[in-house]
Amino acid sequence: MSDYLLQMNGIVKTFGGVKALNGIDLKVRPGECVGLCGENGAGKSTLMKILSAVYPHGTWDGEILWDGQPLKAQSISETEAAGIVIIHQELTLVPDLSVAENIFMGHELTLPGGRMNYPAMIHRAEALMRELKVPDMNVSLPVSQYGGGYQQLVEIAKALNKQARLLILDEPSSALTRSEIEVLLDIIRDLKAKGVACVYISHKLDEVAAVCDTISVIRDGQHIATTAMENMDIPQIITQMVGREMSSLYPTEPHDIGEVIFEARHITCYDVDNPKRKRVDDVSFSLRRGEILGIAGLVGAGRTELVTALFGAYPGRHEGEVWLDGHPIDTRTPLKSIRAGVCLVPEDRKRQGIIPDLGVGQNITLAVLDSFSKLTRIDAEAELGSIDREISRLHLKTASPFLPITSLSGGNQQKAVLAKMLLTRPRVLILDEPTRGVDVGAKYEIYKLMGMLAAEGVSIIMVSSELAEVLGVSDRVLVIGEGRLQGDFVNHELTQEQVLAAALSQPDSHNNKDRKSA
């Protein structure tokens, strides 16, 4: 009998004559966690769709061996029956159903006569949550009453209830806090010890290094290398993923910092559902020409509320003033903000950044269509010229600007949103989680673009939950905690510990507005 639980040999998948996968191999032993690494568009998702029979046997070439026997599944239900379960990045839970009902969805326990056996399902659901070290979870409550970390655990419990022997985890930590990520990684280690195998897909290479035994890298649809993690480090993984040496994940583009051009004065935002509660409380700061200002803080600190208020997009009541070049400007709506020279690339690009029904080019020119208008017609030639220039400038990978934007990888969708805002020629560019869900190569290009824009005199505000990213690209760092300004640091030998200490400190324990640190 084979030592491997799973063997995918010579997998080839073709779309319209183009090989998306060209001879990919992937092997997983029982109790092993394999990190599947590659840039967006490398073929990771296609490979997992083949494994889980989203693309059934016969639509691809090669072979899959499961426990040494050929697997020729025609449906997801067949692969799940075999013990292969995928947990998608976007969770598949039904918010209004209870935790127990979600765990048993499609596999409900019934009594004679066909009625649901709720006591048995609740008992089994409680046992599964105890196994995942969440003994106090009320499995009778709607799953919507629990946060992202708990919902991720419910998805894992759902998979274990299907007798999963191989878990495929696709970007499992994308919506989790740092503490929730640590819980998730501990649970994966426990599952490994019980013989459950995992394929872990993540752009967060520190997580991959922490939990995976083996790293398998694919690039442009081809298998590059499979190596034991103990013989690898993160820079080596990055080099294999992008196909070139990267001296640093954070490129240093020299840029001069000039005079103060932008000021936020006494910004206060009130909760949409509870108008008496302040989500942002009297925050003031300044920004210099060509400066990159990072905003750090814990989840729920009020960072996104602050920057959406600066752009005129905060849905609740908010107060304060925004000044540019020494004068107050009108930022009551996004359109007024754009016209004043202030632009925002939002946190959730799928809901707020792109229009999925439009093409790549249409999304890019959406904010400046009036500049291509001639009476009642659009100057299509001028519009296409601008689109092509931005695609080239941002190294946006697309076969055609007329393709649907949903056909692009996450990193290239983000570049399209950036291109849209750059066409407005902003003086101040606000980036809210600009690299979330973006692969390491695209991250590098976004950081490099930020440095180039700063060198051109554009002032940048960047919100990020990744402290390493904040420290890697920012000239100055603001720390927000419980809606208040907790620290204003010059980024010279600044450490993650200093930033975290400021984020965790009590808002009234010191005079934040005068706080500077080297």
From Swiss-Prot:
InterPro entries: AAA+_ATPase (IPR003593), ABC_carbohydrate_import_ATPase (IPR050107), ABC_transporter-like_ATP-bd (IPR003439), ABC_transporter-like_CS (IPR017871), ABC_transptr_XylG (IPR013455), P-loop_NTPase (IPR027417). It catalyses: D-xylose(out) + ATP + H2O = D-xylose(in) + ADP + phosphate + H(+). ATP binds at residues 38-45. Residues 6-245, 262-507 form the ABC transporter domain. Pfam families: ABC_tran. It comes from the Bacteria. It is a peripheral membrane protein. The complex is composed of two ATP-binding proteins (XylG), two transmembrane proteins (XylH) and a solute-binding protein (XylF). Part of the ABC transporter complex XylFGH involved in xylose import. Responsible for energy coupling to the transport system. Belongs to the ABC transporter superfamily. Xylose importer (TC 3.A.1.2.4) family. This is Xylose import ATP-binding protein XylG. The lineage of its organism: Bacteria, Pseudomonadati, Pseudomonadota, Gammaproteobacteria, Pseudomonadales.
